[in-house]
Amino acid sequence: MKKTHGLDVNPLTDIAICCGQSEAFAAAIFSIINQGDEVLLFDPCYETYEGCITLAGGIPVYVALEPPQWTLDPEKLMRSFTSRTKAIVLNSPHNPTGKVFSRDELEIIAEGCRRWDCVAITDEVYEYITYDNQKHETIAKLPGMQERTIITSSLSKTFSVTGWRIGWAIAPASAASAIQNIHIRITDSAPAPFQEAALTALRSPIEYFETLRGVYELKRDFCMKLLGSVGFRIQFKPQGSLFLFAELPKDCLLSDVEYVEELIQQAGVVVVPGRGFFHGNESCKYQKRYIRVAFCKSEATLNAAAQKFGELINAKACPKIVY
């Protein structure tokens, strides 16, 4: 943390090791949320956040990011804070859109946290996976924020070990202690051999992270070109993460779910309907117009998907999903 973000962290008191980021996030929520507390979430967002909040008795309050660039409206955000707001969840780089929150946006979020005395809970699992010279910054490094931020992250995405379940929360000592106590009562301990492996992984040379970004950037560009060739509207180029959030072709009459079903049946290609990431105003038509594509696949898998799309185009047998 000192080398990457310039933060002083006491490893004995400020870090809680958990079974993946998911447990670290859930434990963070359980450690600070009481019945009726409000938690701000950006919409769209990763679907498990809401469940953790409601399970803890909290109330999710959604702040929509505006498509197609997924911009943050400062006034809308500030209006969402109330005396009941206990925390705000910040995932950057962002799942599903690939957005990296800018320094200006982080400053706005931090101002709301300081003004309303609430906690920022971050999900930074894609912190090393950014593109086009974008840089990830943690909100904890801003003035007055380290003492009111709980950072959660893991090995899973950076080192492609999603099954190892090694994650952590970095927080002020009192919060880290509460998170550790919750972790002990739920899963007892993260696997010790994997913790040893984690130390080796986290000491990887900078060249590893640069190579990782380069490989995924090529895969991102490959998928953008592929989807563009069959009519998808790619109006936002992912700045980070492993996902492409693409809008259905303009002339497509299907919903996101219907399109995904057709794609599976006719091409054998699987993507995720976008509506599962939206939780706010369901009257917004765009919420049923997106799909999420994961490009963290082998070259062989991506080429096979491209071939299947190509066969559909050449056969002209699939007017519902090829435009």
PLM regions: where:
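PLP-dependent class I/II
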Residues: 2-323
